[in-house]
Curated annotation (Swiss-Prot):
UniProt keyword list: ATP-binding, Helicase, Hydrolase, Nucleotide-binding, Nucleus, Ribosome biogenesis, RNA-binding, rRNA processing
SUPFAM superfamilies hit by this protein: P-loop containing nucleoside triphosphate hydrolases
Species assigned in the record: Neurospora crassa (strain ATCC 24698 / 74-OR23-1A / CBS 708.71 / DSM 1257 / FGSC 987)
Record-linked InterPro entries: DDX47/Rrp3_DEADc, DEAD/DEAH_box_helicase_dom, DEAD_box_RNA_helicase, Helicase_ATP-bd, Helicase_C-like, P-loop_NTPase, RNA-helicase_DEAD-box_CS, RNA_helicase_DEAD_Q_motif
Identification of the protein by name: ATP-dependent rRNA helicase rrp-3
CDD domains attached to this UniProt entry: DEADc_DDX47 (cd17954), SF2_C_DEAD (cd18787)
Biased segments, Low complexity type: 15-24
Helicase C-terminal domain sequence ranges: 316-464
Subcellular location: Nucleus
Composition bias, Basic and acidic residues: 25-55, 506-515
Binding-site residues for ATP, renumbered to this chain: 134-141
Annotated SMART domains: DEXDc (SM00487), HELICc (SM00490)
Domain Helicase ATP-binding per the UniProt entry, residue ranges: 121-292
Chain positions of motif DEAD box: 240-243
Length: 515
């Protein structure tokens, strides 16, 4: 986002004009219905004792703005003796968000706050450190972006906030969200990723952006090597997908980054799970935080998601995959595989059969990965074949179906994969292909979910109609993969990544995310 400026230190007039109130007043969340009935005429005492009072009518249900699974975990149970309560949909204005940002939310189609936003935004506006625990697709980005932008409106300053994300795709997505929400207030946002030119990034940092969104490895490179770059005046720190940051061994880098930051700051830590590593990071980086959780359990999936499986012989996996893609033809599909090579092969297989498939994995260059995501988001490709690089954090709207061609190795990854669909209250479908070799993993996944999943209804004869065409496409895919590997072998191999410009290359591979 480009913005004309007279001086680097001058803040945009739009920031000053739309200054936010320092202590926004929150409106009441619920209206209480008085349903107690009074008798106009006196009755006999014996009738009162003999007849029991009629049970109160159930409160009217309001259509939830987001999935009900999340709401259940943060709503207090009402005792039968208590008066009934009608839940009223809140707006962002009700949470204390100023008009300029509410207008930006409306433009982006954010009608009502999600549960994590509803719980965390008022606390963030009170200048509290926050730990937010919520499933993927729950709207965590806006939950921390809106309070930061509102604080920036109140007291404009350069290098105001830093957001750390585990992967380049997630960082790019967060930066886009900040730019979209801050479009009416002349926000300047810098995206600092590994694999990009350090000099160009240093120039962007020298322009003193309001918000920096970065992957940890490349940010530390700039803190250590870029002359004149300092975050000592930074006021907000966000660590998004904190559990993923620590799973990718960013812990030592985060410790070093924290030493470059001021102690007097607000810190928001958002995560899908609360592991022991995340708790350690919390103790090291947050002060007297308030915990907000809208996760019903560790392996929760949203209520709008329909999950099924097909149990088949391993030799027919591709045939069943093609059948399922044909069943969901015209809809957007993400297919998850376990390896980079399998991702590439499946994409070639489906393209050979005339389907618009595109691969996404850690072996691709950064520009190729962003290009694949943009094509899928824009609808020019209806099928995204991906490794777990796409399972966490990426905001890919309107995904109709997720197919697990290869099962993940753990239950947590399963939840994150299927969380790519049925986002923000929308419905979605997830189907897992289970073979005789996957039974142990599948039983562990069902045990973690706490219930058995239903088998997807299909007729074997209808599936086997695709077998001859699939076998022909498999042969073509094998030949193309062989040629691809031979060509890539001459240039360092499909799985090898090129270093950046020689600066910080040792850390660049970490935020690239393995395939």
């Amino acid at each position: 986002m480009s913005t004309k400026r007279r001086k680097t230190s001058d803040e945009p007039s739009a920031l000053k004009k739309a200054a936010a109130p320092s202590a926004p007043e929150l409106k009441k969340e619920k209206k209480v219905k008085d349903k107690s009935t009074k008798d106009k005429s006196s009755t006999k005492k014996t009738e009162k004792t003999e007849k029991k009072q009629d049970a109160p009518e159930p409160a009217e249900e309001s259509t939830p703005a987001t999935n009900s699974t999340e709401e259940d975990s943060v709503t207090l149970d009402v005792a039968p003796e208590q008066e009934e309560v009608e839940t009223v949909k809140k707006t962002f204005k009700d949470l204390g968000i100023v008009d300029a940002l509410c207008e930006a939310c409306e433009r982006l189609g954010y009608k009502n706050p999600t549960p994590i936003q509803e719980q965390s935004i008022p606390l963030a506006l009170q200048n509290r450190d926050i730990i937010g625990i919520a499933e993927t697709g729950s709207g965590k980005t806006a939950a921390f972006a809106l309070p930061i932008l509102q604080a920036l409106l109140d007291k404009p300053a350069p290098l105001f906030a830093l957001v750390l994300a585990p992967t380049r795709e997630l960082a790019a997505q967060i930066a886009q969200a900040f730019e979209a929400l801050g479009s009416l207030i002349s926000l300047r946002c810098a995206l600092i990723l590994g694999g990009m030119d350090m000099v160009t990034q240093a120039i962007a940092l020298g322009k003193k952006p309001h918000v920096i969104v970065a992957t940890p490895g490349r940010l530390l490179d700039h803190l250590e090597k870029t002359k004149g770059f300092s975050l000592r005046s930074m006021q907000y720190l966000v660590m998004d997908e904190a559990d993923r940051l620590l799973d990718m061994d960013f812990g030592p880098i985060l410790e070093k980054i924290l030493k470059f930051l001021p102690r007097e700051r607000r810190t928001f830590l958002f995560s899908a799970t609360m592991s022991s590593k995340v708790e350690s990071l919390q103790r090291a980086s947050l002060r007297d935080p308030l915990k907000v959780s809208v996760s019903s359990n560790k392996y929760a999936t949203v209520s709008t998601l329909k999950s099924n499986y097909v149990f088949i012989p391993h030799m027919h996996k591709d045939t069943y995959l093609v059948y399922l893609c044909n069943e969901f033809a015209g809809q957007t599909i993400i297919i998850f595989t376990r390896t980079v090579l399998e991702t590439q092969r499946i994409a070639i297989l489906l393209r050979t059969l005339g389907m618009g498939a595109i691969p996404l994995h850690g072996g691709l260059s950064q520009s190729a990965r962003l290009g694949a995501l943009n094509k899928f988001r824009a609808g020019s490709r209806e099928i995204l074949v991906a490794t777990d690089v796409a399972a966490r954090g990426l905001d890919i709207p309107n995904v109709d179906c997720v197919i697990n061609h290869d099962l993940p190795q753990d239950s947590k990854t399963y939840v994150h994969r299927v969380g790519r669909t049925a986002r923000a209250g929308k419905s979605g479908h997830a189907i897992s292909i289970v073979t005789q070799y996957d039974l142990e993993i599948w039983l562990r996944i069902e045990a973690a979910l706490g219930h058995k999943l239903d088998e997807y209804p299909l007729e074997k004869d209808e599936v086997m109609v695709f077998k001859p065409r699939v076998e022909e496409a498999q042969r073509h895919a094998r030949n193309e993969m062989k040629s691809l590997m031979e060509n890539q072998g001459k240039h360092g191999g499909l799985l090898k990544r090129k270093r950046g410009n020689g600066q910080g290359g040792g850390r660049d591979h970490m935020d690239a995310e393995e395939g």
